[in-house]
Amino acid sequence: LMGTPKELEFFLTHTLVKFGDKPLAICADHSGFDMKESIRSVLDNNNINYIDYGTFVNKDCDYNDYVAQAVGAVQRGDCDYIIASCRTGQGVNIAGNKFKGIRAAVVHDNYTAEYAVRHNCANFFSIPSKYVNKESFKQIFKTLQANTFDGGRHITRITKAENNESVRS
C-alpha cells in the first residue's frame, strides 16, 4: 500500500468498511416512509442490522430532523452508512451533504449505486421513493454490498471536496 499517511487513514476508515460491520442508519420523511419500510424488509431478509431514525408514521414532516439524527450516528461511530429516502432523493441528499464527513449520493439504479461507492466512496445513499420500489432496491442493495471504493484519482477528488467543508464564504 502506497500513499500519504492521510490516504492510509482514509483507506483504513472508509475503504475497508463493509456493510454489516456496524448497523446501518436508515431514515425518511413522509414521502419516503413506505420506501423506508421496504428498505427495512430488505435489510431484515439479508440479516443486516440497522437503526431506524424515523419518521415512524406517514405524516407530514421535515427530512432534516431525521437526517441529522442518522448523521449523528455516523459521526459518533455507531454506524458507518446511511440509507435515506424522500420522494426525489434530492432533499435527503442535500441535507446529508451539509454535514462534515458525509458523502451523500442519489442512488436510483445499479449503475448509480456502483459508482457512488467505487468513485465517490459514498457513505449516505439517498433513495428516491418515486423511482425505486422494493424489488429494485433489493438489486441496488446487492450492488452496494458488492462494490468497494476504487481509490486512486478518486481519493484526490474526495479530498478536494472535503477541504471545501472548512471553507467559509
Which residue stretches match the model-derived regions?
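Glycine-rich phosphate/diphosphate-binding loop of Rossmann-like nucleotide-binding domains
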Residues: A25-I48
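C-terminal binding/interaction regions
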Residues: F19, A25-G32, D109-S169
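A short beta-strand-loop structural module common to alpha/beta enzyme folds
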Residues: N49-D60
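Short, structured coil segments at secondary-structure junctions
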Residues: N46, F99-K100, N120
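Conserved alpha/beta core of the MobA/IspD/sugar-nucleotide pyrophosphorylase nucleotidyltransferase superfamily
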Residues: L1-K18
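Short hydrophobic/aromatic-enriched beta-strand-loop microsegments
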Residues: Y50, I102-D109
